[in-house]
Amino acid sequence: MGEISQETVEKYLEANPQFAKEYFNRKLQVEVPSGGAQAPASASFPGRTLAEEAALYLELLEVLLEEAGSVELAAHRALQRLAQLLQADRCSMFLCRARNGTPEVASKLLDVTPTSKFEDNLVVPDREAVFPLDVGIVGWVAHTKKTFNVPDVKKNSHFSDFMDKQTGYVTRNLLATPIVMGKEVLAVFMAVNKVDASEFSKQDEEVFSKYLSFVSIILKLHHTNYLYNIESRRSQILMWSANKVFEELTDVERQFHKALYTVRTYLNCERYSIGLLDMTKEKEFYDEWPVKLGEVEPYKGPKTPDGREVIFYKIIDYILHGKEEIKVIPTPPMDHWTLISGLPTYVAENGFICNMLNAPADEYFTFQKGPVDETGWVIKNVLSLPIVNKKEDIVGVATFYNRKDGKPFDEYDEHIAETLTQFLGWSLLNTDTYEKMNKLENRKDIAQEMLMNHTKATPDEIKSILKFKEKLNIDVIEDCEEKQLVTILKEDLPDPRTADLYEFRFRHLPITEHELIKCGLRLFFEINVVEKFKVPVEVLTRWMYTVRKGYRAVTYHNWRHGFNVGQTMFTLLMTGRLKKYYTDLEAFAMLAAAFCHDIDHRGTNNLYQMKSTSPLARLHGSSILERHHLEYSKTLLQDESLNIFQNLNKRQYETVIHLFEVAIIATDLALYFKKRTMFQKIVDACEKMETEEEAIKYVTIDPTKKEIIMAMMMTACDLSAITKPWEVQSQVALLVANEFWEQGDLERTVLQQQPIPMMDRNKKDELPKLQVGFIDFVCTFVYKEFSRFHKEITPMLNGLQNNRVEWKSLADEYDEKMKVIEEMKKQEEGNTTEKAVEDSGGGGDDKKSKTCLML
């Protein structure tokens, strides 16, 4: 045979890599040369050089790289080599995890020898040996996170012979070390029974530690990747469930179903089931009768922590293995495969998270040991947890079955499932809120219907004003033509000149409230809006009568006040000639808003609403009563039979509603001081203009200026009683004062607070002084500026000034009276003091003792 060249050998080895690998594995332990220079010896591997030690690590890295896809395979190859290097009889790997909040170790690779097969050493999930950390040396290693070299296990208090009894193997000594990542123990590696010695040496510990430091890289890499997948799944679950939860707000079942079905691919299980609990806490009285009569046994079954009977009214099964399927079972029977074990009921009763390994073997719960249905599917591992809402009531139970990779559910699965169920539970707040809103909306509709029934003008009340039956001999108003109704209504309305409707001095006291309704109707005809905007007179009559009924029978803010404000608005527009700045539609809206501005007033002011925390105060943050008057007015217009603006187009109607908002909110005196400077600037600008047309153009070209003037007009109308003739003003002022005193009485009795002087009945004699202050501080500016703006409005200022003279006279009389009383009081106090001095004996020496007698 010829000589083999180096080139031939290289070609053969390259062509047969498996042979080359096996050959070098066998020849790895080379003999130390006997002569010549020796290579440096390894401290960790006796009998090997540093080069050979490096070759071992290189081989390990190649193995780890080759088996990087499976942590079990990589660990198995490493344990095989360790068993050889340490001369250990066998090696094992235990994984560390946590379930139900309790850490534990579970066997993953057992009895690994240099020649054993991976399949024989791998422990499948349903055959794992699981220990808590307080059992066995492996548990103690995981607990302390330290390496332990135990020369004699019988002398170690932590040793447990459980595994020996199961396998018949006898453990004499062992070496165990943890793989730690941060504060978390990932696994425990163990070498058992030194073959050529009675115990593992210090050098064995070093070999074990160094070798496993490389293995730990793979474990940490896999664990990091696992944590990344966990967080990715968690974020996807939260994102998709949030997306679906906010898609569905009307029904909790549909909300749950949309969210749970969308995230099914991220739950990593074969099946999951959602049981929805009956939320009824108290039974109806008629359901309790049979129990009280003894005909039915009282309920003695499990109850939720808040006292509800555990009744699943619906179960939804999500089957993800094989053909995907969703089954909805209303009123499920107790022998349904999810309920028969008793686990969902237990979770609903106690609120615990239950993570069960090898569930069919559990003795407490009765899981089916065989297939649960025709698919042949078998329960292995179970994770069940409650769905809890923000009130901490258990609303359902979510149960997950069989992790797809065959492993039991771990603490990270618990975290993901808990995140999902917690989010679903909290999302119930949306549906609960939506349901409450619906109920409130329905109650509002019912209340509105009741309100309309009692407030809306009846047919007989309409007939009392619109006398179609008497004049047309027609029984049903629908049979009348609109022109006929207009004619008979206008005939029956008062003459505006005779009734002084164009005058600022108009007096309402001699006129009945019913006649005031007719006067109000007349004003709409006077501004020519009824025919122009095609307002049905029946609707106008019904609206005006309903507005009158909407005012409560309070002392001052009643229908008479409402009408007076409307009449003053009309007078400002027509007599005061402010109409030239506004269109007919705007004038129509302003007049209607003036009539409605205090509708449903309660006789108390905004401050009282806030102090008493009334529903109105909770509903409206500012301008409380004004916003209520506005909403009431808009509510009336929502009824077609009361909508006097029904024939306007959309844009016109929106304009009217906007003007209503500006006009009615402007009556809040708290806003008066904000707007009066702006109004004064408009007046100053108009006063400098030479022609009327120039002033009209200046105002009308800017909608904001028109709104400011309108807001100030509403204030002037609201305070107009202060400008009426003295005989009217003096009576009205007493009505206002009485209403204030009534509020003061409420503050004193209900709120237990001392009212301010203006509302204190005990200080009613100070009314003239308070009126003078009110005129000077609030009213004078309004009417002075309007008189400057339009000379036609000067009568209001004159009336105000005349009334101030009267009130000042009364205030001065009161001050004089109080001054006299004060002087008399001082004089009386002086006399009392002199008498006290005389009685004390200071007046002379002839005073005798009343207790001692000189004989």
UniProtKB/Swiss-Prot annotation:
A lipid is attached at C852 (S-geranylgeranyl cysteine). 3',5'-cyclic GMP binds at S92, S116, D164, K165, Q166, T167, T171. Binds 2 divalent metal cations per subunit. Site 1 may preferentially bind zinc ions, while site 2 has a preference for magnesium and/or manganese ions. Its cofactor is a divalent metal cation. SMART domains: GAF (SM00065), HDc (SM00471). The modification Cysteine methyl ester is found at C852. It catalyses: 3',5'-cyclic GMP + H2O = GMP + H(+). As cone-specific cGMP phosphodiesterase, it plays an essential role in light detection and cone phototransduction by rapidly decreasing intracellular levels of cGMP. Composed of two alpha' subunits that are associated with 3 smaller proteins of 11, 13, and 15 kDa. This is Cone cGMP-specific 3',5'-cyclic phosphodiesterase subunit alpha'. It comes from Bos taurus. The lineage of its organism: Eukaryota, Metazoa, Chordata, Craniata, Vertebrata. The gene is PDE6C.
